């Protein structure tokens, strides 16, 4: 991660850093690759992660980014679902992988996801990415029983926002 080129994105309250996002962006591919959202110790539960996420997506949407990808730990799934994410695969750590068009606001992201339920093609990444995501599945991972259980529970929790089946083909349009 080259943080000289991609400085962490910080949220300050009363001149104090309260939350940070670590991500890289590519102007060539118009992708944001988000690595981590951190709320500093003692600042949890005050909505700062949502504040920084909201500012972050608005900033990068306005800067011309088109898609965002990230891995979401099972313990963070509920929060990410509130922000309009969909999920395709499971990474080597058992986190759920999201890759989708970037919208300017959380509400627009949620509205987009609801539309994608009826028209999944609008959310699909490019073919090369789809092929890579197909290779990332719970069954192929060497995870502990505890991790596998947490991952399966996260997949159950995301419910209809688990878009993995669409990596293998799209249903007939529901319109």
Residue ranges and their predicted role:
Residues 29-31, 67, 95, 112:
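A generic structural signal for beta-strand entry/edge sites
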Residues 39, 45-58:
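Conserved acetyl-CoA-binding loop-helix of GNAT-fold acetyltransferases
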